[in-house]
Amino acid sequence: MFDFMVYSPEVNAFLMSRGPGSTPLWGAAEAWISLAEQLMEAAQEVSDTIVVAVPASFAGETSDMLASRVSTFVAWLDGNAENAGLIARVLHAVAYAFEEARAGMVPLLTVLGNIIHTMALKAINWFGQVSTTVAALEADYDLMWVQNSTAMTTYRDTVLRETGKMENFEPAPQLVSRYCMDRRDSVNSFHSSSSSDSLYESIDNLYDSVAQSEEHGSDSMSQSYNTCGSVAQSELCDSPFGTPSQSSQSNDLSATSLTQQLGGLDSIISSASASLLTTNSISSSTASSIMPIVASQVTETLGRSQVAVEKMIQSISSTAVSVDVAASKVVAGVGQAVSVGALRVPENWATASQPVMATAHSVPAGCSAITTAVSGPLEGVTQPAEEVLTASVAGGSGTGGPAFNEAV
């Protein structure tokens, strides 16, 4: 590709004459010169502002360190300015070489004229009368070949030599220390990762759980106190002969409220525990990247939530004990009411002798124990029923058996 000696003079002349010429080379050289000037101005401005003014105004270790680090940046700007100027000089040299190669090239029309003239003479050289002229034209063509090939070869050598002088641009020096870079990367990764969102969400859930536990504990305490008050009032105001439905309803109400209270406590404790576990796991995984203020807030939140849960458990335990005591008293009253109310007999049973007669025949002999058991504490209460049963047995056939008659 770069061996221009193998190309004929017309080919080299054609390749050199086509294209935009050296105009792009001159334009690129001017651009690099402008860049070199801007870099030199920037380096001078930074040097005058920081390297010289800061140590003079603020003497100390910090200002000296700043001036030292900025000095490396100023040196980098100066080096790039020199490199840009070198590239501009190289482009100038290449443009000059191109102009010289074009100027030393045999024009394309001259080469084509020689070729056409030689071919025409050869066409009429029947007897060799123009052989000398043809040989001279061919010798001129050979000189054209050498001249054009030499011009292209010289241009090639100049371009390779000048471009070899250029140097690569160095990256900018690091003005910030490695420690500050690591801290910045840690903060950026913490703010951009999902773990920070999960941590903030867990903290919010923990605050919500504590608030719900306090609110639910207050409501449960109020409901338990109201239930205990209603049970105590029912125990004091009800008569000994009341029906067992009232005490049973109070007992069911207190048991239901206690169950709901304990169920709410379980759900609150579960949610608070989940929030605590999530917060602990996230805190341990991001302990190396979060700020100390976040860790202190998490520790304070955990302590507050633990104290709130302990207070709520103590209040629920005291409420459960109060409800159990009241329920035991109501159950005792219900037992007495059942033993009394179950033996009340309506007055119209005195006329219903035949159905009682049939029932008495079917009662087994062991019913004497039941009659004896209930007749003791109910003196003066079961007398009408006893008289009815005695009259009914006396009017019948008396096949109830000796045990039944003795019981009656």
From Swiss-Prot:
Residues 209-235 are annotated as: 2 X 6 AA repeats of S-V-A-Q-S-E. Keywords: Repeat. The keyword Secreted does not apply. Sequence repeats lie at residues 209-214, 230-235. The gene is sra. It comes from Mycobacterium leprae (strain TN). PANTHER family: GLUTAMINE-RICH PROTEIN 2. Belongs to the mycobacterial PPE family. Transmembrane segments: none annotated. GO terms for biological process: response to host immune response. The keyword Repeat applies. This is Serine-rich antigen.
